[in-house]
Amino acid sequence: MENNAILSALSARKSVRVFTPDPVTPDERAAILNAAFQAPTAGNQQLYTILDITDPALKAALADLCDHQPFIAGAPLVLVFLADCRRWLNAYHAAGITDARKPGAGDLMLAVADTCIAAQNAVVAAESLGIGSCYIGDVLENAEAMRDALHLPQYVVPACMLVFGRPTEQQQRRPKPARFAEKAVVCENVYTDRTPDELRADFAAKAAANGQLDYDFDKAVQAFCKRKYASDFSREMTRSAEVYWKEFL
């Protein structure tokens, strides 16, 4: 569809990790947060809390905890999105419901979905204002230290972190990486595994779209596995996620 501003923004959006010194204005911050609040939410519960990180020392601590990424500390706007199963539990208690069950795994999954939907609304709103963003998945690591740093109580779990700012000219010029084609990620009615040959074709097509014409599937996937899936930070993320999950089981 031509001349659709929302679709154009969604297609153009890419992660930005280098920002100009210009601040995110109070009006822009308010618009980004309001967009998050307007996101679809299960039962209109808004099962999340958003931390606006304004303390430079805390920004620096988060940058260190999140795989030592200094650009986090320098971002004009840093928001941590927490899956919050505590607010409604406290409301139940305040309403005199003494036998309210503790939140379970299903409640956490619903809250994480709510939280990530709100976060993506914030990303799209920022993009419409010319403000770039980057998701920081490493906020799931170092559960104990993260709980201490953010004063997280029981039944409150970090789902994602976002940094915002105006992209530099270099970041604006940087091409967005191509995605998989539809056939690689969409199944009709039921889940269907891609065959090894189909996987090779899917990955090669994406690589070609990104200008990698000499793509070697085995070499590339093995390197990615070593760098990401089998990495120390990935193992730490899994360990920390299990720490958070335990209180819901």
Give each language-model segment a name:
Residues 1-249:
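Acidic, surface-exposed loops and disordered segments
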